[in-house]
Regions:
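PP2C/PPM-type serine/threonine phosphatase catalytic domain
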Residues: 1-375
Length: 375
């Protein structure tokens, strides 16, 4: 039987922490062991050099905000004012803490450009979903930091043109290649495990959102009244374009059939009306190789926006937020914290409210991951 709020059937496995991961645990601040957070507030960690570390099955990236020695810096003032990221593990219906299958990525000042930044949320699912999402953090960290075409760029506009060229060819290829590289990982079985990818790339005044799955990014702007702009579209099996593709591949989209003969829960992708596998509640995913032949693909959708003076902030989050909170609910919670320039407080309150909603439903709670970016 499937849980209504899970993207797939999961037999959770706790990954082992290797020696290198254990060695750096002593540098971590004392925080709630069930909440993973990175101090991405620009008021903190200014003197640290950039580094990454692991804790509680998570990858963190802390960035140095010091601009000294940045010869390629084309802006004296950064466009992004403040940002913060936090992830909280879900709970079983018995109240036990689950393995957090979410991961997130924050890379700032890539290639020494003050306004070349990447923010991404990866929501893993399946028996080894946590390993898939962690792999994607490592893969995209390497891609953005070491890609030779990016390194050749001497100005931010060149980076943007590189990404925009031929309908986002470089980014499109990078995301598809991530799935191919995932298949090569001997320690990860991705047949029935995968991850979403909701990625925001900021280059100067331009925003590119690349999305696979149902993690979501929204942009809030304000002229006369507050306006919510979807930077990504959820990839759900019952949505027209997704449904047509899945049927073309021979897949079946149905709600889960329970023992009492009732179809219930979200629409899922199945191999047949017998509902043998994979039972995915999303129609695009990185991984889930057994579902590829059913039309569940890693093909990203892109959205392009220009940052304007009336734009206030961006929220990127896994469906642990969106399951019970609407876009409007989220903006109402964040509003007071935006006025105080408190991205950390905004995320903590957002996760608190989402957790309360999950508890009210009396079900197991999903992992929750949020990135907030203030302009």
């Amino acid at each position: 039987m499937l849980s209504e709020n899970e993207n797939s059937i999961s037999i959770l496995k706790t990954p082992k922490i290797n020696n290198e991961q254990a060695k750096i645990n002593h540098i971590l601040p004392k925080i709630n062991p069930n909440v993973n957070q990175a101090l991405f507030n620009n008021q903190n960690e200014r003197k640290r050099k950039s580094f990454s570390y692991f804790k509680d099955n998570k990858t963190y990236v802390l960035m140095n905000n010091n601009n000294n020695g940045n010869k390629k810096n084309s802006f004296e003032k950064r466009i992004i004012k403040n940002y913060f990221a936090l992830s909280q593990a879900g709970k079983t219906s018995d109240g036990l803490i689950k393995t957090n299958q979410d991961s997130y990525l924050v890379l700032t000042k890539i290639n020494n450009f003050s306004n070349f930044n990447v923010f991404a949320v990866f929501d893993g699912h399946g028996p080894e979903g946590h390993l898939v999402s962690q792999f994607l953090v490592k893969y995209f960290t390497d891609f953005f930091n070491n890609n030779q075409e990016i390194k050749k760029c001497s100005r931010e506009i060149e980076v943007f043109n590189l990404f925009l060229h031929a309908n986002y060819k470089v980014l499109h290829h990078a995301i598809l290649l991530s799935e191919e590289k995932l298949k090569e990982q001997k320690n990860i079985n991705s047949e029935y495990s995968g991850s979403t990818c909701c990625m925001l790339i900021q280059v100067s005044q331009k925003l590119i959102c690349a999305n696979v799955g149902d993690s979501r990014a929204i942009l809030i702007s304000e002229m006369i009244k507050e306006d919510i702009i979807n930077l990504s579209n959820d990839h759900k099996p019952n949505f027209k374009k997704e449904l047509e593709r899945i049927k073309k591949y021979g897949g079946v989209v149905e709600k889960c059939l329970y023992e009492d003969g009732v179809f219930d829960g979200p629409y899922r992708v199945w191999n047949s009306s017998k509902q043998e596998y994979p039972g995915l509640a999303i129609s695009r995913s990185i991984g889930d190789t057994k579902a590829t032949k059913l039309g569940v693909l890693a093909v990203p959708e892109f959205n392009l926006k220009t940052i304007k003076s009336n734009m206030k902030y961006i929220v990127i989050a896994s469906d642990g937020i969106w399951e019970y909170l609407t876009n409007k609910n989220v903006t109402e919670i964040i509003k007071q914290f935006y006025n105080l320039d408190d991205a950390k407080g905004a995320i903590e309150e957002l996760i608190k409210k989402a957790s309360e909603k999950w508890a009210q439903e009396g079900e197991s709670a999903d992992d929750i991951t949020v990135i907030i970016i203030f302009f």
